[in-house]
Swiss-Prot record:
The modification Phosphothreonine is found at residues 246, 360. Residues 1-25, 306-320, 413-428, 438-447, 454-463 have a biased composition (Basic and acidic residues). Regulates the proliferation and differentiation of hematopoietic cells. Overexpression block the TPA-induced megakaryocytic differentiation in the K562 cell model. May also prevent cell apoptosis through the activation of the nuclear factor-kappa B (NF-kB). Residues 61-79 have a biased composition (Basic residues). InterPro entries: Hemogen. Residues 1-32, 44-91, 265-290, 306-369, 386-471 are annotated as: Disordered. This is Hemogen. One of its GO terms (cellular component) is nucleoplasm. The keyword Nucleus applies. GO terms for biological process: cell differentiation; regulation of osteoblast differentiation. Expressed in hematopoietic precursor cells, thyroid and spermatids (at protein level). Expressed in bone marrow, testis, thymus. Expressed in prostate cancer and ovarian cancer. Also expressed in thymus and thyroid tumors, non-Hodgkin lymphoma, various leukemia cell lines, peripheral blood mononuclear cells (PBMCs) and bone marrow mononuclear cells (BMMCs) of patients with leukemia. It is found in: Nucleus. PANTHER family: HEMOGEN.
């Protein structure tokens, strides 16, 4: 407010002067030239005095303000003295700390200078992560703070000694540098130690990569397993494709399906045996057996491929023994392993086969039992009997294999659990087939109802197979089984 008032006064004092000058100036310029010169001089002198007076007035105000400040100088001096007494310590401390930090910063910040002195140390420090630099800086700052505190105490006690101490850290700077270099050596060792986990980290990365490779290996193993799955299928096909033993194994399967398996196909199997055993089964030699087996393999393969086309059941059931090739092979090998037992049991089967042969004339003549069995099929569907008879004419193995996988799917477990009991069970069935025939015919009828149209298509697909199969099968039924 004072400034505003002063400015207003200045304006009021200044504004009338030019008006006066303007008013009087034409007079001076005009007629009153000579007189007015003196007046002009007087007025100029007055204006100059006013200006000087105003200037002096302003200076006096300024001086008054300075005087008020000067009057308080004593108290301010006391405050300034106390502040100066308090302030020089942090200022001196700051100067000392800055002097101490300057060489240390020169030492810590440029690692290139360290490389000049310690090239062997600097080379790992180049690889040192930034965190370790920060840790080193923190440690150096800790030492600097301790050193600065020591210097502060010395400054407070002896200002002259502080200068010596200030000069001494410059003198001691190589020692500090050596200490810091030792710390840096230790830090480099630490960094090397940290580099070692970094070096170990490639090992971990290798382990991770190995693990990543292992899933690839696992994938390869899975792929191998997937490759093994076709190998399993191939192995499942191999015992069907291999010439003598595997075909005999399939003959064992056929024989077991005819003789050992306690299923409703067994009486039909016996019907097949009774139909085919009188068809000169004894005229075949072992060589004919081997030739017929090898010749019968290819139609078997076709037949194995074709029951997949028959129905979903047969496809699933034919797939099951392929998914269980080793199990079936083990089950096939099991009767080989207790060969003496099987030989001991096979005479029984021969005896029963004799009984079968005793029954076969009735079966050729369609004895009442078997004829009752077959009309049971005819009662269900006359086409079924025709189809089954055509299948018996074309390939009995087709008939064995089409429901055979059902037998395998259900009976392999029975063979796993009780491989030996499979042999006496058919004796019970041969002794009393009529007791189990109704269930047998019901299940056979179910199988036959599931397959009628597709079974019709099968004999059309296999026109040229029947002779070979008729040659191959009867040997595979009884005699190959007896030979084992």
């Amino acid at each position: 407010m004072d400034l505003g008032k002063d400015q207003s006064h200045l304006k009021h004092h200044q504004t009338p002067d030019p008006h006066q000058e303007e008013n009087h100036s034409p007079e001076v310029i005009g007629t009153w030239s000579l007189r007015n010169r003196e007046l002009l001089r007087k007025r100029k002198a007055e204006v100059h005095e006013k200006e000087t007076s105003q200037w002096l007035f302003g200076e006096q105000k300024k001086r008054k303000q300075q005087r008020t400040g000067k009057g308080n100088r004593r108290g301010r001096k006391r405050q300034q003295n106390t502040e100066l007494k308090v302030e020089p310590q942090p200022q001196i401390e700051k100067e000392i700390v800055e002097k101490a930090l300057a060489p240390i910063e020169k030492k810590t910040e440029p690692p290139g200078s360290i490389t000049k002195v310690f090239p062997s140390v600097a080379s790992p420090q180049k690889v040192v992560p930034e965190e370790h630099f920060s840790e080193i800086c923190q440690e150096s700052n800790i030492y600097q703070e301790n050193f600065s505190e020591y210097q502060e105490i010395a400054v407070q006690n002896h200002s002259s000694e502080t200068c010596q101490h200030v000069s001494e850290p410059e003198d001691l700077s190589p020692k500090m540098y050596q200490e810091i270099s030792v710390l840096q050596d230790n830090s480099s060792k630490i960094c090397q130690d940290m580099k070692e986990p970094e070096d170990n980290s490639p090992n971990t990365c290798q382990v991770i990569s190995v693990i990543q490779d292992h899933p690839f290996k696992m994938y390869q193993d899975m792929a191998k397993r997937e490759d093994l799955a076709p190998k399993m299928c191939q192995e499942a096909a191999v015992p069907k494709i291999l010439p003598c033993p595997t075909s005999e194994d399939t003959a064992d399967l056929a024989g077991c399906s005819l003789q050992a398996y306690p299923k409703p196909d067994v009486p039909k199997g016996y019907i097949l045996d009774t139909d085919q055993n009188p068809a000169e089964p004894e005229e075949y030699n072992e060589t004919d057996q081997g030739i017929a087996e090898t010749e019968g393999l290819f139609p078997k393969i076709q037949e194995i491929a074709e029951p997949k086309d028959l129905s979903t059941k047969t496809h699933q059931e034919s797939a099951e023994p392929k998914y269980l090739p080793h199990k079936t092979c083990n089950e096939i090998i099991v009767p080989k392993a207790p060969s003496h037992k099987t030989i001991q049991e096979t005479p029984h089967s021969e005896d029963y086969s004799i009984e079968i042969n005793q029954e076969t004339p009735g079966s050729e003549k369609y004895s009442p039992e078997t004829y009752q069995e077959i009309p049971g099929l005819e009662e269900y569907s006359p086409e079924i009997y025709q189809e089954t008879s055509q299948l018996e004419e074309y390939s009995p193995e087709i008939y064995q294999e089409t429901p055979g996988p059902e037998d395998l799917s259900t009976e392999t477990y029975k063979n796993k659990d009780v491989p030996k009991e499979c042999f006496p069970e058919p004796h019970q069935e041969t002794g009393g087939p009529q007791g189990q025939d109704p269930k047998a015919h019901q299940e056979d009828a179910k199988d036959a109802y599931t397959f009628p149209q597709e079974m019709k298509e099968k004999p059309k697909e296999e026109p040229g197979i029947p002779a070979i199969l008729n040659e191959s099968h009867p040997e595979n039924d009884v005699y190959s089984y007896v030979l084992f």
